[in-house]
UniProtKB/Swiss-Prot annotation:
Zn(2+) binds at C13, C16, C35, C38. Residues 1-54 form the ClpX-type ZB domain. HAMAP family: ClpX. ATP-dependent specificity component of the Clp protease. It directs the protease to specific substrates. Can perform chaperone functions in the absence of ClpP. NCBIfam families: clpX, PRK05342.1. SMART domains: AAA (SM00382), ClpB_D2-small (SM01086), zf-C4_ClpX (SM00994). InterPro entries: AAA+_ATPase, ATP-dep_Clp_protease_ClpX, ATPase_AAA_core, Clp_ATPase_C, Clp_protease_ATP-bd_su_ClpX, ClpX_bact, P-loop_NTPase, Znf_CppX_C4. This is ATP-dependent Clp protease ATP-binding subunit ClpX. It comes from Listeria monocytogenes serovar 1/2a (strain ATCC BAA-679 / EGD-e). GO terms for biological process: cell division; proteolysis involved in protein catabolic process.
Amino acid sequence: MFKFNDEKGQLKCSFCGKTQDQVRKLVAGPGVYICDECIELCNEIIEEELGISEFVDFGEVPKPQEIRHILSDYVIGQERAKKALAVAVYNHYKRINSNETKEDEVELSKSNICLIGPTGSGKTLLAQTLARILNVPFAIADATSLTEAGYVGEDVENILLKLIQSADYDVEKAEKGIIYIDEIDKVARKSENPSITRDVSGEGVQQALLKILEGTVASVPPQGGRKHPHQELIQIDTGNILFIVGGAFDGIEQIVKNRMGEKVIGFGTDNAKLKDDETYLSRVVPEDLLKFGLIPEFIGRLPVIATLEQLDEAALVSILTEPKNALVKQYKRMLELDDVELEFEPTALIEIAKEAIERKTGARGLRSIIEQIMLEVMFEIPSRDDITKCIITEKAARGEEEPQLQLEDGSIIPIKTSA
C-alpha cells in the first residue's frame, strides 16, 4: 500500500498514489485515504459486476413507433392515447438531451400530459408502462390527498419525495423521472368564477402544483410530512420531470356539446350514448377544461391532452387474454405451479367482461371478479394431488355453479363436492 504522505508532507491516495493536489477530493478513513477517481473506478467495477442497468440513455430514446409498440404489449386499445403519449414522451426526453448538450440556442419547453378517460380505461397503466419502457424512476400520487401548504393534508412536495424514493434517493435520476397524478379532476374548483373563500383542496392544490409542473428547485423533507425550521431538506429541480395527470372528468362531454352548440334529443340506447360520449370526449380542448374547473395557469402547463375511450366488452375480453401480463395467463401460471391446467371457456370470459361493465369498474375491476370466482379453486387445489384440470364455465362466471374439476380418472366434478 502507498504511504499516506509524500516527502513534502502531502496526503496521498492509498490506492493510486496520487497526491491531494492531483485529485479533486481525498476522502479519509481509519488509517487510509481514497481519491475521487478511485471511488468512481470502484463504482464502475461494482456496477459492471452486479449487472446494474443504468437509467435511460437520453441520447437513445425509443422512437414514437417503438414506444407505441411496447405499450401495446401491455395496454389493449386506446390507440389515439398511445400515439399522443409516445410522441409527447419522445419529445420530452429529446428535449432533455438537447437542453443538456446546449448545442442549440433554442431552449425547448416542457410538455406535460393530461389523460382524460373513464375509471379503469388504462390511464395509470399507460403511465406505469412508459416508465418501465424508459427505465426511469416513477411515482404515483392521488390528487384528492393533497392540500395547499399550511393546511391538514399532504403537501405537493411529498409527491417529489415519492419519486426520490423510487430512485433510491439518487436526486439526479429522480430529476428525469415521471410522476403520475391521478384524480386530478377532483381538484377542479366548484365554479368557473374564482372563489372568494379559500378552496384548499381544489383551486389551492392547482396553485400549489403550478411551480413544480413548470419547473422549479423544490425543497423536500427527506422523511416526508411538513417542513420545519432547521430541518435538512433535499433540493430537486423539477424542470426535466415529466408530469402526467389523469382523471375521469365526469360530465365534460356535456361541456363539449354545449360549446359545439349541439343538444341531445330523445332517449337513445346505452351503446348509442356510449358512442356519443366517446365522440365528444375526443374533442376536448383547453377551453372545456377551464369550464370544468381547472384554472388557466394549470391548463397552460398541460399542453398535451390525450383522451381514452370507455372499454367495451370485446376490449375487456382482450385485456383478460392478450397482454404479456394478462390476468388469465397469470392465473394459469399459478395453477400450473400446482401441476393443474386452468381453462376459461370463451363464454366465461364474456361474462366476466359483462360483470366489469355492470360494476362500472372497467379493466381495474377484472381481477377482483376473477379472484371471487377462483377463491375456492385456489383454496382446494394445493391440498389435492388427484386434480389435473380446472374449468371455469359460463355459469361459474355468473356465480350459478361452482368451477369444475377434472380428476386423474377423467371424471369431472364441481369443486364443492370434491372434498
